[in-house]
Amino acid sequence: MAMYPVYAAAVQAIYENVDEQWCDLHIVTDTSLKTFEQLINDEIDLVFMAKPSDEQFAEARAQGKTLRLTPMGREAFVFFVNAKNPIDNLTAEQIQEIYTRKITNWKKLGGVNSRIMPFQRPDGSGSQTAMHRIMQDKPLTKPIREEYQQLMGGIINRVADYRNYPNSIGYSFRYFATSMFYNEGIKLVSINGVAPTVENIQNGDYPFSAEFYMITLENPSKESQQLIDWFLSPLGQQLVEQTGYVPLKTL
């Protein structure tokens, strides 16, 4: 879902005279988890997403599928807090200690005397996969959960969406947090003293920066390969930058 702006802009740049019906037929927008399942089940040809989890790679292998990952740009995995929180910087180790509950109060980090509310994302999502990598095999605390009323009357229990309380902390990819669902009441914290700016993401100084990918099966279709080649061209990389992401190289 967080990659939607870049491939939606590509459709407008590449294809002529396409209508809503054509887009509904050829472009699928869903969560990383669902679109990945569709890829390995041969329902779609190409997925735009962060690097799949180890479990997703294993799932593909179990179905006899080999994945082909082509980098198309760089993104940052960011942590955010309430804008009024005095904390502006955290170390990678402190992030791990917050999410293993070794640190439970902002006061220990130089903030106010308030219990930390560490929000997470659902398993299988791109954000949660990235978070597991940051934790380096350290066990995440159980996520905050909430009950959700479905349209048909049923109630489901799910991982809670981020709530911007004064003592909250959450995480996501930079574009998602700063553009798609921008909230002026939050602020991004620096990690190890490095802010998630475009320059720091591109040169790799920001510690939680990584490439995002166009993912196909081992032998992509001719049309998929043409789209991949276009995104790697100067025009495609310019579009990546114009939609708010970080191109692979300085343009």
Regions found by a protein language model. Name each.
Residues 1-75, 80-251:
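Exported/periplasmic ABC-transporter solute-binding proteins
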